[in-house]
Amino acid sequence: MTRVVFLRSKSPAGIEPRLAKEAGTLARGGYDVHAILWDRTRSYPTHEVRDGIRIHRYRLAAPEGTVGLARRLPRWQWFALRKAARLRPDVIHAIDLDTAWAARAAARITGAKLVYDVFDFYADMITADVPPKVRERLASAEQRMIERADLVIVPDLRRQAQFRGARPRRIVEIMNVPQDRPPRVRAAPDFTVFYGGMIAKDRGLLDLLAACESTGAKFIVAGHGPDENALLPHLETSPACMFLGTIPYEEVLSQTAAAHVIAALYDPQVPNNRYAAPNKVFEAMMCSKPVLTSDGTTIADLVRSIGCGVVVPYGDRWALQRALEGLMLSPDNCERMGARGRAAFESGYRWEAMEARLLGAYGSLLGSPAAAAPEPPSIG
C-alpha cells in the first residue's frame, strides 16, 4: 500500500478541515495516510486515528503570534523530519513553508515524492512588521520549494501570481470547498452574523463588532489566532458578541446554518488576503447563506459573479453598517442570495468535485492510471 505522510505545523480542533478532506480522500482511495501535526495547545492525544488518517502530534506548547513561536520552529522541524523519515513514506505532503525543510530532508533520505500544498504564501501572509530582507528571504525559500516539489497544490490557480516567477514541475488547483453536508438546524431567533476563522487584526472583526452593536445584530465569533490579546477584550465584553473559542468543525457548520449572514472580511492591503479562498465562504454557499465580504479580493469577485452576498470596502464602518442594515431589512433578498450561492455550490464548488482531481494528480505523480476528472468552475 502506498504510504502518504502529511506535515502541518498546526492542529486546530485536532485536525483542520482542508487537511482532513485531502487526507481523508486519499485514505478512502486506498492510500496508507499519516499526518504529523504540531499541537501547540497540548489539547489532543499524541496518537489518534480519524477517518482512516493516522495522526501523530508533536505536543509542544507555543503561543500564537509571539516570538516564542518562531523560536520553537526548529524543534518542530526536527521532530517532523525524524518522524517522517521513520515512517518511510512513498509521498511526503508538506503544507506551507514551515514544514519545507523537514519535508525536503525526509524526502531525500527516503526517496519519497514531494508534494507542496500552498494553503498560504508565507511571505505575503505575515502581517507583523518584519524587515523587508526577512520577507524576501521567506519568498525566496518558498520559490525554491515550489520549484523542487514534484507536485504543487493551490486552492486557486491565481495564486501563481505570488510565485514571483517560480515554475512548478506540476501544479493542480484543489479548491477549498466543503463536502456537501449542510446541517439541519433551526435559524437563530435574532439576526445573527457568524464569523469562524483566524482571530487576527486583518479580518475586520472590530468593524463587524461596531456594525452589530449599531444595528442590533448578534455577532458570534469562533476561532483562534495571533491577535487574541488585542481583540478578545473587545469581543468578550460587548453585549452584541458571543466568543466561542476553537470549536469542532461540525459545530462550525451548525453555527453557519443557524446564522443569517456569514462574515468573510479580509484586508486587501495584506497581499495574501487578495487571493484568500476561505472555506467559510463555500460553507455559506452550501448552507444557502449570504456572504458579507470586502472589496479587492478574489472572494469579492466570486460573490459578485454569483450574486451570493454583499461586498463592502474594507475598513469602511459606515458602508459595513449600511450593508448589514440592508440585509436585516430584506430577508427575501437574503434568501435569494443564499439560493444563488447554493446553486453555484451544487454546480461544482463542493469537495465531491475535488476528490477525483486530487486522486488523479496523485495517480499521475506515482505513475498509476487515473480517470480524468470533470473540471469544476474556477474561482471568480
Label the model's feature ranges.
Residues 8-13, 25-72, 159-173, 225-226:
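N-terminal strand-loop element at the rim of the active site
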Residues 123, 139-183, 243-244:
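Donor nucleotide-sugar binding/catalytic pocket of nucleotide-sugar-dependent glycosyltransferases
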Residues 229-256, 261:
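Nucleotide-activated donor-binding/catalytic signature segment of Leloir-type glycosyltransferases, i.e.
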Residues 261-264, 283-293:
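Short hydrophobic beta-strand element within catalytic cores of glycosyltransferases
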Residues 305-306, 310-318, 326-332:
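Conserved acidic donor-binding segment of nucleotide-sugar-dependent glycosyltransferases
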Residues 326, 333-348:
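A short, well-ordered alpha-helix in the C-terminal region of glycosyltransferases
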